[in-house]
């Protein structure tokens, strides 16, 4: 009824419902701006067009953040494939606390680069930072919150404050034990997968031997 009353029509780009969403967000933004506040929301806000001063949190990959930055809107990068800490830290899910799914090892978190190369230097100025998300539908205790966050939070910190040319995962691993000592002092519950020994087995059919790479 509201769509009809406002005379909103869909087109090839967006549905009428998406345009109604944009209308509501723009109305809400004006109210908040009048109170000295700014609006911020997930990248679904792009559907139907953004309100003028919106800040976008890009969680469905990076495309929403890229689109918003090209429109000169502030962006916080939060792609689920790199920064959703409610994903499992190990593939051995049978021995892990229950999680929503997915797989996000600390190495992948560390590898994230929040400045898309598809943006110009001027457009990159609208990327204000990154954010990890930890939804707690499957997390009943604060101790498990710590487990899901640590030490992935340390990798997130370096994503934010280290320039790409200076990032070095091997060096990060060398420094991590010092931080883990702090975790121990405060009795934080942290995951230890990063310290596991990973072995690759390569059979040699010619002589029946087995190469093991650690």
Spell out what each predicted region is.
Residues 1-55, 59-72:
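Active-site neighborhood of glycoside hydrolase catalytic domains
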Residues 20-23, 27, 148, 152, ...:
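Extracytoplasmic/secreted proteins, especially bacterial periplasmic and envelope-associated proteins
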Residues 33-43, 75-79, 163-169, 191-192:
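Acidic/polar loop patches that form or flank catalytic/metal-binding clefts of enzymes
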Residues 37, 52-55, 66-109:
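Polar, glycine-rich mid-to-C-terminal structural blocks
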Residues 39-42, 55-58, 74-78, 128-133, ...:
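Structural recognition of the beta-strand scaffold that forms the well-ordered cores
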Residues 51-53, 72, 125-129, 209:
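Active-site lining segments that contact anionic ligands and/or coordinate catalytic metals
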Residues 79-89, 100-173:
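Substrate-binding cleft of secreted/luminal carbohydrate-active enzymes
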Residues 180-214:
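Low-complexity, disordered linker/stalk regions enriched in Pro/Thr/Ser/Gly
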């Amino acid at each position: 009824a509201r769509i009809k009353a406002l005379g909103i029509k869909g087109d090839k780009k967006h549905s009428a419902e998406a345009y109604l969403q944009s209308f509501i967000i723009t109305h809400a933004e004006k109210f908040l701006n009048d109170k000295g506040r700014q609006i911020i929301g997930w990248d679904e806000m792009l559907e139907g067009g953004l309100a003028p001063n919106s800040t976008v949190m890009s969680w469905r990959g990076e495309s929403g953040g890229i689109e918003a930055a090209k429109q000169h809107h502030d962006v916080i990068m939060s792609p689920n494939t790199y920064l959703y800490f409610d994903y499992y830290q190990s593939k051995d899910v049978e021995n892990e606390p229950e999680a929503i799914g997915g797989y996000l090892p600390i190495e992948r978190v560390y590898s994230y680069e929040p400045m898309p190369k598809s943006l110009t230097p001027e457009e990159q100025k609208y990327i204000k930072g990154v954010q990890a998300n930890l939804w707690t539908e499957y997390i009943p205790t604060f101790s498990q919150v710590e487990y899901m966050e640590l030490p992935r939070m340390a990798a997130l910190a370096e994503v934010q404050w280290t320039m790409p040319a200076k990032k070095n995962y091997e060096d990060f691993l060398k420094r991590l034990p010092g931080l883990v000592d702090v975790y121990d002092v405060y009795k934080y519950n942290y995951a230890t997968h990063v310290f596991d020994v990973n072995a690759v087995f390569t059979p040699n059919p010619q002589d029946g031997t087995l190469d093991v790479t650690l």
